[in-house]
Design a protein with these regions (language model features):
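Conserved redox-active cysteine motifs that mediate thiol-disulfide chemistry
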Residues: 49-67, 71
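Short, internal strand/loop/helix patches
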Residues: 80, 91-125
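Short loop/turn microsegments at loop-to-beta-strand junctions
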Residues: 22-23, 44-46, 124-126
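Short pre-active-site segment immediately N-terminal to redox-active cysteine/selenocysteine motifs
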Residues: 43-45, 50-54, 86
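Thiol-/selenol-based redox modules, centered on thioredoxin-like
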Residues: 124-158
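A short beta-strand-turn-helix
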Residues: 25-45
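N-terminal targeting signals for export/organelle localization
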Residues: 1-28, 158
Length: 158
């Protein structure tokens, strides 16, 4: 309980707001390929931060995105997960659950901090919808791991 309170205080001060431009970042994905955020200007992207790969809560959330991923693709929406895990851990998780989208390793915790999603020990479970112009369209600070993917898809397609 104490750690959760500290995590909240730790990142609230630096949170981005809807309408802000997304910070530019470079991270390695699960295959150790460099992901450059600037290369995705012109595309809508869902970026979600999560605590740890292969934990019960995060597995539900990731599989929720997997289960309706085709709908995201049909609507030209990319999905990307970011955590402090190593690229290797993310690759194992992606393969274990047959997850069709990319995961990025923020092992230095710099990207989470730039988004205001950093916590003391893990990133906060937060999601950012980034529009085609690189601006934050929507921020989800409260996440229901069972329905999160469906909620985002509904919000973006209705």
């Amino acid at each position: 309980m104490f750690a959760a309170s500290i995590n909240s205080l730790f990142s609230e001060k630096f949170s981005l707001l809807e309408g802000d431009f997304t910070p530019h970042f470079e991270l390695f994905d699960q295959d150790n390929k460099l992901f450059l955020s600037k290369n995705f200007i012109g595309e809508k992207i869902v970026v979600y931060f999560f605590p740890y790969a292969d934990t019960p809560g995060w597995t539900k959330e990731a599989c929720g995105f997997r289960n309706i991923y085709e709908e995201f693709e049909k609507n030209n929406i990319k999905v990307i997960g970011i955590s402090y895990n190593s690229s290797d851990a993310l690759k194992k998780f992606k393969e274990k659950y047959n997850l069709p989208f990319s995961f990025l390793s923020d092992s230095k915790k710099e990207v989470a901090k730039s988004f205001g999603a950093n916590g003391l020990f893990t990133p906060k479970r937060m999601t950012f919808v980034i529009n085609e112009n690189g601006k934050i369209e929507k921020i989800y600070k409260k996440v229901n791991i069972n329905t999160h993917a469906e909620t985002i898809l509904k919000d973006l397609t209705s």
